[in-house]
């Protein structure tokens, strides 16, 4: 088995929902998470007798250790918008190109490293766009601001003029995602902060006049998010330097 990327889902509270996707962060192959997850996933593949082709698995870290959520006999999803970033981080290859090499050029495939490089060749991550408002979109000035960011690689969205936007509470109400990558990690973080502030300021869209554009109560006082959470506060079951997992 070869591991071409390992990700941590960034899930947080927003708009009264306890688990909203804010993005995916690649993690170093020498990180504490990767040292647990990579051998675990390879053990799952062996147990399932999967020897050929790409796979995409999801693991939840619990107080009892890693727990398998799913194992798919396919490449990582997202319409492949992550491929340019992974190639940049890995130095020229991705799960897609590795799969092609496995079938078309075995010599090249076997020459690929056992797992992704440490450290990465650049900094990168996927930012899922979160809506704190609702209404009918008139224009999307925030898209051009995002496209001009130094670390911008790709914007994927189906939200445009005429679209109905609602509060983001799950993957289906996300307004899009942005792939960011830059050789300077501080630049990427600066751009990410800019996007998050645009979300909170409702600066990505201009809404139609005459439509009651409603703002999420969380944007008025982000510290009060817990007051709108559904059910009991989640309990931390695993914490590392990069991620906290709740149950």
Feature map (PLM): residue ranges:
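Internal nucleotide-binding/catalytic subdomain
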Residues: 1-69, 73-76
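Short acidic, gly/pro-rich beta-turn/loop elements at beta-sheet edges
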Residues: 4, 16, 79, 137, ...
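Generic "edge-of-domain/loop-turn" microfeature
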Residues: 13, 66, 76-78, 134-136, ...
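Short, charged/polar low-complexity linear motifs in solvent-exposed/disordered segments
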Residues: 20-24, 84-88, 99, 206-209
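Short, intrinsically disordered/low-complexity patches at protein termini
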Residues: 27-29, 91-93, 211-214
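Generic structural signal for well-ordered, non-membrane alpha-helical segments
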Residues: 30-37, 92, 171, 185-188
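Active-site "cap" helix and flanking loop/linker of ATP-utilizing ligase/carboxylase catalytic domains
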Residues: 35-57, 72-139
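Peripheral (often C-terminal) accessory segments that flank ATP-dependent C-N-forming ligase machineries
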Residues: 98-247
